[in-house]
Design a protein with these regions (language model features):
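Amphipathic alpha-helical repeat scaffolds
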Residues: 10-14
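A structural signal for short, well-ordered beta-strand elements
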Residues: 17, 40-41
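Short, well-ordered alpha-helical segments enriched in acidic and aromatic residues
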Residues: 8, 18-31, 35
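A beta-strand edge to alpha-helix "cap/lid" segment located at domain peripheries
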Residues: 4, 35-37, 48-138
Length: 138
């Protein structure tokens, strides 16, 4: 079952990449629920109203890790927007009878190379605070 779950996961992301709503609609069970930090177990109709409009802003999904067991998969992926912005998320997907019945998304971070952190220089007033002074030995 694990290999077929992997196939379903890749088909799900491919539907977003190709903006094929018909494929995605065929994958989601009528009882489908979606949760994220912004959504709490919304149903199919709300999912398509809230989430599908962003499909036009996403260019590519690269699955970096996938753990599948039974009818469930947990994945980490990097997504790339149409503007080139990249970010990483994780998702837990649960299938029944080949249909996606539950999806939970956990938002990650921007994966563009970070600018170097600025070098901190202590102000004279900071030296008066013992805890702060320990961070900046003279």
């Amino acid at each position: 079952m694990t290999s077929s779950i992997a196939t379903l996961v890749h088909r799900y992301f491919s539907a977003y990449e190709t903006r094929d709503r018909q494929v995605l609609e065929g994958m989601l069970d009528e009882s489908f629920t979606f949760s994220s930090p912004l959504d709490d177990r919304i149903g199919r109709a709300a999912y398509f109203a809230r989430c599908w409009p962003t499909s036009g802003t996403l260019r590519r999904f690269t699955v970096e890790k996938m753990f599948a067991q039974g009818d469930e998969a947990f994945i980490r992926y990097e997504a790339e927007s149409a503007t080139g912005r990249k970010f990483r998320n994780t998702e837990w997907l649960r299938f029944e009878g080949g249909k996606l019945v539950e999806l939970q998304v956990y938002f990650g971070r921007d994966t563009r190379p970070a600018a170097p952190l600025p070098v901190l220089t202590p102000s004279p007033r900071m030296a008066d605070w013992p805890a702060t002074a320990a961070l900046f030995p003279r």
